[in-house]
Amino acid sequence: MFCPSIKPGLNYGGQFLPAEEIASHPEVDFVIVATVGKVGLGPTLAALRAGKTVALASKEVLVTAGEILVSEANIHHAQILPIDSEHSAIWQCLQGEKSKPHRLLLTASGGPFYHYSQAQLAAVTPEQALHHPVWKMGKKVTVDSATLMNKGLEVIEAHWLFSFPFDSIGILIHPQSIIHSMVEFMDGSLKAQLSWPDMRLPIQYALSYPERWANPGLPRLDWNKINSLDFEPVDYDRFPCLKLAVEAGKSGGTYPAVLCAADEVAVELFLSHRIGFTDIARIVQGTLEQHRRISRPSLEELLAADNWARECATWLSLGGNRKHERRDNPGTKR
């Protein structure tokens, strides 16, 4: 199934072109960025500067450099379309609305360990963390879902995608993952987007927008089998990664870039059995505490902060307890 405007046979003559060159190529009008970490930042910027429509699944790209990306999109009349199910849901709920909403509500499954005690969380193994109760994802995002870091990154994403203040973005635990997000309006009414948890739907919608394509391969909700839709408040104490992410987003500057980089290192260390599950938050927090924030960073300063954070997180994982100094820890606060 292809939209007529998609060119599945596009041929560049067998050359392997740099991702930035492909993303900004004159024959390309639609770019999907679905990478892990900062590797997608360069191609995303290149595409936006070339005025392309970018469907973004790489949350780290927007978290790290959201202000720069949104600015470039506005300058070059480019579009950023969300692929994440939660942001796609909000995007769909906002269509046709002229009034600014009162609040955005992101839902989270809670991951496999939401009702674990602190002692149980400390004993979680990589093998356990890689079994998500609802979604089938890559290793990094699956672990981030278990720590709820993923939901914190999505709060920062929502802030940039929808130009919405952090204090008006809420989170609800919704184990069934049927409601993907909700929007509350000034009159107290709510809109929600519901569907079976299947990433093919938000991906397809980004491709088909502003139309909707029929796809018999996508599962439908059977209301005869859905007995309840449950919700719980978020427990920030047992899942500190979520709180760290939201606070980093509110503080802004280079903090979100440092958050992403430190988390990426910590998750890799956990997956290789070198640190425990609860050490992920400890390392991320320690890295953020040692960082000297730049309030309005350039792209080069964001990349320097990313590199510094990776070194600091690695150093902390080895038992470092003194301040981690390095020349590219972005200078003095400003």
Where do the PLM segments sit?
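Catalytic, metal-anchored helix/loop core of enzyme active sites in primary metabolism
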Residues: 1-334
